[in-house]
């Protein structure tokens, strides 16, 4: 075989290898299935259930332990994703008088002490309504902290997270907006699983879909 043909063949095979390594991941958990909850790893002290095609955080977790982090997570069982898009509808069921209500999307989950989370809340302050990383110590905010509150009521909200672990880009879109409500850039954790949760409140999630590329 001629050298040029060999080079072209090598390039073609390398392309196939890269494409195979980047085979996309896609999951839309059937929340109507009797065993739907088994698709998730429960982390923390909250109580979860599946009913009426919803993943329900029935009982809020209680923050505690050696580091400050969300107290109730349900992490989808999958391999680690380098790039991920998470779409979900969520509704807070915290009492009306709870102004700092929150619900979360988890991503880059490696372990109970190492993950990212998007914290959508009814107020914005140092600890609410932002993007945070837990890296074997108390959670740390990584966005600029200027976004207006995104979860001020008990209505359904559509949320989309886009995350690229190679560049560190993190963007969160709420209720179909063209511009992200929250954004950050961080590469502390390159890849991990995704999930849902709350720091210390209750809520409901439905129409969950996850797509992306594995590590």
Q: Where are the regions a protein language model picked out?
A:
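Secretory/extracellular carbohydrate-interaction modules
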Residues: 66-133
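Short, solvent-exposed beta-strand-to-loop segments that form ligand-recognition rims
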Residues: 173-193
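Beta-strand-rich interaction surfaces with strong enrichment in secreted/lumenal proteins
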Residues: 72-79, 144-151, 195
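Ligand-recognition surfaces built from glycine- and aromatic
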Residues: 186-215
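Short carbohydrate-recognition loop motifs
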Residues: 49-72, 130
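Extracellular carbohydrate-recognition regions
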Residues: 21-45
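Short, aromatic/His-centered strand-loop micro-motif at the edge of beta-sheets
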Residues: 136-158
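Short tryptophan-centered beta-strand motifs in secreted/extracellular beta-sheet-rich domains
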Residues: 155-165, 170-172
């Amino acid at each position: 075989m001629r050298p040029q043909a060999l080079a072209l063949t090598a390039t073609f095979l390398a392309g196939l290898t890269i494409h195979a390594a980047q085979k996309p991941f896609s999951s839309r958990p059937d929340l109507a299935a009797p065993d739907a909850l088994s698709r998730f790893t429960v982390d923390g002290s909250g109580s979860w259930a599946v009913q009426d095609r919803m993943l329900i955080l029935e009982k809020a977790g209680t923050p505690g332990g050696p580091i400050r982090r969300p107290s109730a997570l349900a992490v989808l069982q999958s391999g680690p994703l380098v790039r991920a898009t998470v779409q979900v509808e969520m509704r807070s069921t915290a009492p009306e008088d709870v102004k700092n209500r929150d619900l979360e999307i988890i991503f880059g989950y490696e372990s109970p002490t190492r993950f990212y989370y998007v914290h959508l809340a009814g107020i914005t302050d140092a600890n609410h309504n932002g993007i945070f990383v837990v890296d074997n110590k108390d959670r740390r905010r990584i966005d600029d902290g200027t976004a207006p509150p995104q979860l001020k009521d008990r209505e359904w909200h559509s949320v989309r997270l886009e995350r690229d672990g190679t560049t560190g880009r993190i963007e969160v879109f709420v209720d179909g907006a063209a511009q992200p409500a929250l954004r950050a850039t961080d590469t502390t954790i390159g890849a991990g699983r995704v999930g849902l949760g709350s720091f210390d409140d209750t809520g409901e999630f439905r129409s969950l879909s996850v797509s992306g590329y594995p590590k």
